[in-house]
Amino acid sequence: MNHIQEAFLNTLKVERNFSEHTLKSYQDDLIQFNQFLEQEHLQLKTFEYRDARNYLSYLYSNHLKRTSVSRKISTLRTFYEYWMTLDENIINPFVQLVHPKKEKYLPQFFYEEEMEALFKTVEEDTSKNLRDRVILELLYATGIRVSELVNIKKQDIDFYANGVTVLGKGSKERFVPFGAYCRQSIENYLEHFKPIQSCNHDFLILNMKGEAITERGVRYVLNDIVKRTAGVSEIHPHKLRHTFATHLLNQGADLRTVQSLLGHVNLSTTGKYTHVSNQQLRKVYLNAHPRAKKENEI
């Protein structure tokens, strides 16, 4: 990559607080774009709309999903927007390109009994389970992103208010409450997890060596929990975020509150979590519709 692209990625990291996972996606998108430029003997600075359309066709020829193509085009559009702030002679060749529509999907989530099974796996008070349990509790109890989790400092935990302050996208702070189970797991972790008692930094979630855990480390921990849990086959940090939102909405939380807890700027982003289980739909219907039950069933 050239120095402009490297500066762009650094800006996303420092000023927009992008997670390492998101930054890696942006970097991969730029690398693939550079390979196309080299293959077609094109220059970054003279790349134009016609070339952008050819690149779109190139992406589809690689049998990529529409969501992947959409993200890659969005990356390049954002990159050129950044470059335009540095050089007034630069024109964004992707600004007029029709964005491929994303496939609609329902976010995956765990049912409550599946969450109980996961927590049961880490209930024994071993040193590793103390750490694993606090990761699981915080992600499920607060719905925070894994990038927010790994940056929590001990001083960000407020035991008086029972909540945590996290730094979200765009470096925006928000306070998220947690419940009694999560509080108990944090207290046990701080009191009995030996690496945190001897470390020389303030990060809350550590690996077994006493270093601040990485996003990859969190994914490894979650995958390990799943391997030890019968009846649960797949997990990723965002699935716990989906679960947090789904369970709140299923129990009657309003969309605006969930939006605030998740740190979403737009309500439409939160709206994708309004899917509910068939059981919950039937429960609401039976309680709300005048002719859902016969008189002898009431």
Curated annotation (Swiss-Prot):
One of its GO terms (cellular component) is cytoplasm. The keyword Glycoprotein does not apply. Pfam families: Phage_int_SAM_1 (PF02899), Phage_integrase (PF00589). Residues 105-286 form the Tyr recombinase domain. Residues 1-84 form the Core-binding (CB) domain. It comes from the Bacteria. Its main location: cytoplasm. GO terms for molecular function: DNA binding; tyrosine-based site-specific recombinase activity. It is found in: Cytoplasm. Keywords: Cell cycle, Cell division, Chromosome partition, Cytoplasm, DNA integration, DNA recombination, DNA-binding. One of its GO terms (biological process) is DNA transposition. The active site is at R145, K169, H238, R241, H264, Y273 (o-(3'-phospho-dna)-tyrosine intermediate). Belongs to the 'phage' integrase family. XerC subfamily. Forms a cyclic heterotetrameric complex composed of two molecules of XerC and two molecules of XerD. HAMAP family: Recomb_XerC_XerD. Site-specific tyrosine recombinase, which acts by catalyzing the cutting and rejoining of the recombining DNA molecules. The XerC-XerD complex is essential to convert dimers of the bacterial chromosome into monomers to permit their segregation at cell division. It also contributes to the segregational stability of plasmids. This is Tyrosine recombinase XerC. It comes from Staphylococcus aureus (strain JH9). The lineage of its organism: Bacteria, Bacillati, Bacillota, Bacilli, Bacillales. The gene is xerC.
